[in-house]
Amino acid sequence: MTDKRKDSSGKLLYCSFCGKSQHEVRKLIAGPSVYICDECVDLCNDIIREEIKEVAPHRERSALPTPHEIRSHLDDYVIGQEKAKKVLAVAVYNHYKRLRNGDTSNGVELGKSNILLIGPTGSGKTLLAETLARLLDVPFTMADATTLTEAGYVGEDVENIIQKLLQKCDYDVQKAQRGIVYIDEIDKISRKSDNPSITRDVSGEGVQQALLKLIEGTVAAVPPQGGRKHPQQEFLQVDTSKILFICGGAFAGLDKVIANRVETGSGIGFGATVKGKSQKATEGELLSQVEPEDLIKFGLIPEFIGRLPVVATLNELSEDALIQILKEPKNALTKQYQALFNLEGVELEFRDEALEAIAKKAMSRKTGARGLRSIVEAALLETMYDLPSMEEVEKVVIDESVIAGQSEPLLIYGKPEAQQASGE
């Protein structure tokens, strides 16, 4: 095609698509008996780009990663917790395989398998859920069970969880229905006693009842974007049977419930045996033997436990595991701070004894991996405050005494440019 302003007879030319004349546009491109202006070309490019954006996610979804691939990806970001990663990999693979096959296989209806993660604070429950969502490229949202109440009471309704998920994908219902919801602190909504409550328990058993249908699968009516400001708009209908719910909690004291059962010889299915005082199991070993009856005694109602058939237990992280977390994952904490210092043109070095001191401090605080950042941040605060105003600093070294608060980080200076040029 050629760029023409007038035809051979000198007539004024017009775009065949928008009808604008040659004087109203910058360029007019001619073809056999047809003309198109630069504005229409730009519009066509925009339409094509939008189409590509819509098609791309479908192409990405065509290849569902295998359990081995899911586990391998989790290994890149989460240290330890091997059993939990394997359980999650299989459960997530089966969930999305069920969605791809329309909930049925050869006429057999495939049930939904939501997941319950049990483990101490800072053991990696939230990180596992976030990493899974990132790998699968699906919308992800988190909810805190302690803020939820029954409908009609002050607090968050359970339907708000679905609204948050919709917000993460710009209110695209189809995308939201493939998402993952992580509900944290699920152990905090246990009822206060083994017996059904006589009075209203709006933040405990009542919330469990409210979550039942949502987790099992229902069509939730969610206000559209803008909510109450546009009451004339119809509610969005979201099918929660396609959403994967992962519930997590520390379940402090659950190990004692399990110990009481195991030590009386009532363990079922795990070959539990009576142990003497010298053979007391660790908390992690006890949690790995959890049974539905233990969760009922803890305060979860049987119907709620039934909606969470896949249970994965996480162990408390050891000192060695915390050191690995500091330096090995792709987004390890030390790598993050080194990248931050690199932006100032400065190298940051953590000596091995410093990493050990950070891990020891986190162990003493009993905050797990979650407490590592605050320890490193406190050690580097003064340096990060002063560094942008300092010149010629080439390297910052962190050793054990810095973590203990006994000394400042070691600053290594380079030669000034003038000295380097003169060879001094």
From Swiss-Prot:
**Any keyword NADP?**
no
GO MF annotation list: ATP binding; ATP hydrolysis activity; ATP-dependent protein folding chaperone; protein dimerization activity; unfolded protein binding; zinc ion binding
Q: Where is the ClpX-type ZB domain?
A: 2-56
SMART domains in the record: AAA, ClpB_D2-small, zf-C4_ClpX
- Any idea which positions bind ATP? 120-127
User: Looking at the record's lineage, which domain of life comes first?
Assistant: Bacteria
Instruction: Give a GO biological-process term.
Output: cell division
Tell me the PROSITE patterns matching this sequence. Answer: CLPX_ZB
UniProt keyword annotations, A-Z? ATP-binding, Chaperone, Metal-binding, Nucleotide-binding, Zinc
Which positions are annotated as binding Zn(2+)? 15, 18, 37, 40
Q: Name one GO cellular component term.
A: HslUV protease complex
Functional description taken from the UniProt entry: ATP-dependent specificity component of the Clp protease. It directs the protease to specific substrates. Can perform chaperone functions in the absence of ClpP.
- Report the sequence similarity comment from the record: Belongs to the ClpX chaperone family.
How does it associate, per the subunit comment? Component of the ClpX-ClpP complex. Forms a hexameric ring that, in the presence of ATP, binds to fourteen ClpP subunits assembled into a disk-like structure with a central cavity, resembling the structure of eukaryotic proteasomes.
The name on file for this protein is ATP-dependent Clp protease ATP-binding subunit ClpX
